[in-house]
Each structure stands twice: as C-alpha cells, then as structure tokens.
C-alpha cells in the first residue's frame, strides 16, 4: 500500500470510531442514550470552548482591548445570529442572494428584513409639518386657507390656475 491508501484507511478508521458510538446508541438501545453524546449547539459553550474563550479574553486585555462582548459560540458569533437585509431587496434575496448568503454563512442564522426607506418617510413627515404649520398660521391670523385672491397654484399633474378665476359664480 502506498501512503495515500494509509491516510485514507486511517481517516476512515477515525470516522468509523467516531460514529460507532452514535450508531450503537441509536440502533441497539434507542431508549438508552449516553449523556456524553449530545447535539452540537454553537450557542452553548463546552469546557474546551470556555478555556479558549478565557485565553482569548486574556490576550485581548493584554492588547488593551477591554470590550465585554459576552459569551460567544462557534466562530465568535453571538447567538442567536440575525442577518439584516433591507425590504427593498426582498425580491432580489428570494431570487438570488438568500441561498448564497445562508450557504456561505458558517453558523445557523435567521434573516430579518428592515424598512430601509426611512429617508422618504422623514421627508413626508417634514412636508406634513410644513402644511400643518402653514394652515395653523392661516387660521390664527384669520386668513382663508386658500391663500390670497389672485394667487397662482398648481394641481399635481395639471396646469397652473388662477384662484380669482374660480371664485366667481359656478
């Protein structure tokens, strides 16, 4: 046998040894489960992970990094992991990007869509406040809200009109 076959055989032996305990538990005695065989959950730290986390914190403090980010799971992510995506890209996500994002993301995550048109909402609120203030000033001064006679105004999508031409008989 050449060296590549030995490596393959060693790898297969290791895999079989690792999975043998799981196979025995599930096939021979499904009602008896070994407490050492648990599902891996990245948000739960194991003893080895805690030691590594402690060493990383000590190294970070030595470097002057004093951020307290709390317990982290696999690959340093705080769980539950949420990926935020703007609502305007929902259709793009559903068609292309979502599968790629979730396939390439190393841990389980959920995607949350947020409303990304906050600028237009703020502009609408500003316009509403301008109109409100204008009409409040007109009412306080006793001025008719249809502005003075002879003022020009425009209807959205229409030509400019003169108010005085519409104040006469109908």
Swiss-Prot record:
Compartments, record wording: Nucleus
Positions of the UniProt region annotated as Disordered: 143-170
Disulfide bridge partners, by residue number: none
Matching Pfam families: Ripply
GO MF annotation list: transcription coregulator activity
Predominant place of localization: nucleus
Polar residues bias locations: 143-152
InterPro entries recorded: Ripply_fam
Any Gene Ontology CC annotation: nucleus
Region of interest called Ripply homology domain, as start-end residue ranges on this chain: 79-114
GO biological-process terms attached to the record: anterior/posterior axis specification; cellular response to retinoic acid; ectodermal placode formation; negative regulation of transcription by RNA polymerase II
Intervals of motif WRPW motif: 40-43
Annotated keywords: Developmental protein, Nucleus, Repressor, Transcription, Transcription regulation
Subunit structure: Interacts with tbx1 and tle4/grg4.
Free-text domain note: The Ripply homology domain and the WRPW motif are both necessary for its transcriptional corepressor activity on the transcription activator tbx1.
Family the UniProt entry places it in: Belongs to the ripply family.
Role: Acts as a transcriptional corepressor. Negative regulator of the transcriptional activity of tbx1 that plays a key role in pharyngeal development. Plays a role in the formation of the anteroposterior (AP) axis during embryonic development; required to establish the posterolateral border of the pre-placodal ectoderm (PPE) acting downstream of the retinoic acid receptor (RAR) signaling.
Protein name: Protein ripply3
Gene: dscr6
């Amino acid at each position: 046998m050449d060296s590549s076959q030995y490596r393959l055989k060693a790898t297969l032996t290791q895999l079989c040894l690792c999975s043998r305990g799981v196979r025995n538990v599930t096939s021979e005695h499904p009602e008896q489960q070994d407490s050492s065989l648990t599902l891996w959950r990245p948000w739960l730290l194991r003893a080895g992970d805690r030691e590594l986390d402690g060493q990383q914190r000590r190294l970070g403090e030595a470097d002057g990094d004093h951020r307290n980010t709390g317990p982290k799971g696999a690959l340093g992510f705080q769980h539950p992991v949420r990926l935020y995506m703007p609502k305007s890209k929902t259709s793009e996500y559903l068609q292309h990007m979502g599968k790629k994002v979730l396939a390439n993301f190393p841990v389980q995550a959920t995607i949350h869509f947020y409303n990304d048109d906050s600028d237009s909402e703020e502009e609408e609120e500003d316009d509403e406040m301008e109109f409100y203030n204008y009409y409040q000033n007109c009412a306080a001064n006793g001025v008719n809200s249809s502005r003075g006679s002879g003022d020009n105004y425009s209807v959205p999508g229409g030509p400019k009109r003169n108010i005085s031409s519409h104040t006469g008989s109908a």
